From Swiss-Prot:
Pathway stated in the Swiss-Prot or TrEMBL entry: Protein degradation; proteasomal Pup-dependent pathway; Protein modification; protein pupylation
Protein name, as recorded: Pup--protein ligase
One Pfam short name: Pup_ligase
Catalysed reactions, semicolon-separated: ATP + [prokaryotic ubiquitin-like protein]-L-glutamate + [protein]-L-lysine = ADP + phosphate + N(6)-([prokaryotic ubiquitin-like protein]-gamma-L-glutamyl)-[protein]-L-lysine
Active site residues according to the UniProt entry: D58 (proton acceptor)
């Protein structure tokens, strides 16, 4: 599939604390306060926005944002950043309301994957694949790539080995920097579950499109990344690997003996050279898997994707050579590795110190006034590829080259004219009696007569009515 639609779902960590750092509100209460404007706008904590994205409160009081369908990976990054901005404003407004009510409380939203209590949050990637392809063949080739790509696209973090049974906490092993903390929360290679037995690839068959033509590949192993370069690489490299697999040509035989053991071993080896047992009885390394896939997909990349290959290679080389000079200002794991070691050395503490844990959380805070990552961007120590105008435009404008364009048109028109409506990924409908739903099962559709008729119906039904003000966005 040369042209592919994809999307990103991000679960945010939510905490509400007093000025002294103690908990001010339980997550459920904080979530209710956070979503108050959302519920006021859509009478629900689950809404689709003018940019065709979905903003909602997931199970467990996790705020979540799902981008609209994108067929350009930089547009996906812009749409993802737009979600960060919207949630950051919701958090700031909620904090202001709490202060006006006399409460010492600040709501923080964290774009990370593990909190201080060990709770895990997801960053789920979605890729459109052809139903006629051999979906059961995908994991065999895709899993080694997904297990090892953390050496380039991981968010980085610190783990401390648990003490032996019955041993005191102080006897736990030394804290260690890893490519990805998410790796410790994967329990299966392939499964239809998403939480209790969290897999690398989720196989639940929900295509959000014509089920006779399409299937949705749901990858839930990824880290939530603050760096635009890291986020872009996650999608652009995976897309290239999928194209190679779909081509039907000979592929690198890199199947691993135990994907879950391998993903944990790769996370802890910052040299990328730990021997990983393969299914055929041999061994490989994370660097070898990534390099072989990069070399293999080169022929599938067009001229506009040469920068993806170059950036991918620079990421691999940063691990292979140990020279982090480029990676430490572009890739999340390397930015954090340098930052954490600098702070630990300056304070005379090890990586297991609570100050480093607080620094990790602050790095992933999406509030630009609180975020360590945003501070690094302002100092030129972290990448800022997309200009502000593009991110701001993505807050209210859906991608124009996918089905999202149609959904965005309907939501925008309905909100502007005060017309009640219900939409989801495939269906658009007004909520008046007798209204017929319009289905858009082709994710690539940007024009549809039935949608044009629905837009005319919205305008006609609102004739003479005052326009509604724009909702939060």
């Amino acid at each position: 599939m040369k042209r592919r639609v994809g999307g990103l779902e991000t679960e945010y960590g939510l905490v509400c604390v007093r000025a002294d750092g103690s908990r001010a509100l339980e997550p459920e209460a904080a979530a209710r306060e956070l979503f108050r404007p959302v519920v006021a706008m859509g009478r629900s904590s689950n809404v689709f926005l003018r940019n065709a994205a979905r903003l909602y409160l997931d199970v467990g009081s996790h705020p979540e944002y799902a981008t609209a369908e994108c067929d350009d990976w930089w547009e996906l990054v812009a749409q993802d950043r737009a979600g960060d901005r919207m949630f950051a404003e919701l958090a700031a407004e909620a904090t202001e309301r709490l202060a006006a009510d006399g409460q010492d409380a600040r709501i923080h939203l964290l774009k990370n994957n593990v909190d201080s209590a060990g709770n895990a949050f997801g960053s789920h990637e979605n890729y459109l694949v052809d139903r006629r392809g051999e979906f059961t063949r995908l994991p065999r080739y895709l899993l080694p790539f997904l297990v090892t790509r953390q050496i380039v696209t991981g968010a980085g973090g610190v783990v401390r080995p648990a003490p032996a049974d019955g041993a005191p906490e102080q006897e736990a092993g030394p804290a260690q920097f890893v490519f990805s903390r998410r790796s410790d929360h994967m329990w299966e290679a392939v499964s239809s579950a998403t939480t209790r037995t969290r897999p690398i690839i989720n196989t639940r068959d929900e295509p959000h499109g014509d089920p006779t033509r399409f299937r949705r590949l749901h990858v839930i192993v990824g880290d939530s990344t603050m760096s635009e370069v890291s986020t872009h690489l996650r999608f652009a490299t995976t897309d290239l690997v999928l194209r190679a697999i779909e081509s039907g040509r000979a592929l690198p035989e890199l199947a691993l003996h135990d994907d879950i053991a391998a993903i944990r071993a790769v996370a802890r080896d910052l040299t990328g050279t730990t021997a990983i047992p393969t299914a055929d009885g041999g061994t490989t390394t994370a660097i070898e898997v990534q390099q072989r896939w990069l070399d293999h997909v080169t022929e599938f990349a067009d001229e506009s994707e040469q920068d993806v290959l170059e950036t991918w290679q620079r990421g691999i080389d940063a691990v292979r050579t140990g020279d982090r000079s480029w990676a430490a200002t572009h890739l999340d794991w390397a930015i954090k590795e340098r930052l954490f070691h600098q702070v630990a050395e300056r304070r005379g503490v090890d990586l297991g110190d609570p100050a480093i844990e607080r620094l990790d959380l602050a790095y992933h805070d999406i509030d630009p006034t609180q975020s360590v990552f945003a501070a690094l961007q302002r100092r030129g120590l972290a990448p800022q590829v997309l200009d502000e105008q593009r991110i701001e435009r993505a807050r209210t404008t859906a991608p124009t080259t996918t089905r999202a364009h149609l959904r965005g048109q309907v939501v925008t028109a309905a909100q502007e004219h005060g017309v009640d409506h219900v939409v989801d990924w495939t269906t658009l409908r007004l909520t008046r009696p007798g209204a017929m739903p319009v289905q858009v099962l082709d994710p690539f559709a940007t024009e549809l007569p039935a949608v044009d008729a629905l837009l005319e119906e919205i305008r006609a039904s609102a004739a003479g009515a005052p326009e509604s003000p724009p909702p939060f966005a």
